[in-house]
UniProtKB/Swiss-Prot annotation:
This is Phosphate import ATP-binding protein PstB. CDD domains: ABC_PstB_phosphate_transporter. The keyword DNA-binding does not apply. GO terms for cellular component: plasma membrane. NCBIfam families: 3a0107s01c2 (TIGR00972). PANTHER family: ABC TRANSPORTER I FAMILY MEMBER 17. Its EC number is 7.3.2.1. It comes from Thermus thermophilus (strain ATCC 27634 / DSM 579 / HB8).
Length: 271
């Protein structure tokens, strides 16, 4: 039986660690509490630019909590307390002088369940751009470009100005949410189990899209699906009980894990 005390006694196992120069995000000594319950324990990890990093681990291990710490979404939960730093392009986003709303403009997020606005497809994608003051032909050009990058344009080009985003299929709605997120050109895109509510065909479309997105963006994805992590990611983090147990290139984590707990999880002995 794996205990928290046993995990905390061991340092994170790191294979081919990411250098400071390679990192878009540098997490240093991050701990987080929901009220009196500690959810993350002294996590330090770097997320490299233009790569996909997957976060895996059993339910309740802190995957989504870590992900939401990267754009301060956890601030919205009453009673949250954070220690440590999250450096985004060298700036600690938890510095009291940093506006969390401004942070979220730079860091896009796609949730487990598609959440399109009750607006037209066009207005869904235009929403963030309008907040930035983009208007006229530039607005339309950027909406179309985002829909193309999200592999949705060909399916909606004849109706995107008049049809509600709520009328799209589940897979299309998720791609619409991705288009909305990338329209404002965020260097970092966070995805919290983006395909868990989708059928296999829609899942394949999103996975193909993730592989394309890393050419322009840095992507961090939380997934319960280990096969998905193996397919789409360059690096993988394995978490358990709020502790970062092991991190490294995805191929290493899945074929030659160094930590016995990682191996036990990968081979299905717990989880």
């Amino acid at each position: 039986m794996v205990s928290l005390e046993m995990l905390k006694e061991h340092e994170t196992v790191r294979t081919a660690p990411v250098s400071e120069a390679e990192a878009l995000v540098d997490v240093r000594g991050l701990s987080l509490w929901y009220g009196k319950k500690q959810a993350l324990y002294d996590i330090s990890v770097r997320f490299p630019r233009n790569q996909v990093t997957a976060i895996i681990g059993p339910s309740g291990c802190g995957k989504s909590t870590l992900l939401r710490s990267l754009n301060r979404m956890n601030d919205l939960v009453p009673g949250v307390r954070v220690e440590g730093e999250v450096l985004y392009e060298g700036v600690n986003i938890y510095d009291p002088r940093v506006d969390p709303v401004a942070v979220r403009r730079h860091i896009g997020m796609v949730f487990q369940k598609p959440n399109p606005f009750p607006k037209t497809i066009f207005e869904n994608v235009a929403f963030g751009l309008r907040l930035m003051g983009v208007k006229g032909s530039e607005l339309e050009d950027r909406v179309v470009e985002a829909l193309k990058r999200a592999a949705l344009w060909e399916e909606v080009k004849d109706r995107f100005k008049k049809e509600s985003g709520l009328r799209l299929s589940g897979g299309q709605q998720q791609r619409l949410c991705i288009a909305r997120a990338i329209a404002v050109e965020p260097p970092l895109l966070l995805m919290d189990e983006p395909t868990s509510a989708l059928d296999p065909i829609a899942t394949q479309a999103i996975e193909d899209l993730i592989l394309e997105l890393k050419e322009r963006y840095t992507v961090v994805i939380v997934t319960h699906n280990m096969q998905q992590a193996a397919r789409v990611s360059d690096r993988t983090l394995f978490m358990h009980l709020g502790v970062l147990v092991e991190e490294g290139p995805t191929e290493v984590i899945f074929t030659k894990p160094k930590h016995p707990y990682t191996e036990a999880y990968i081979t299905g002995r717990f989880g």
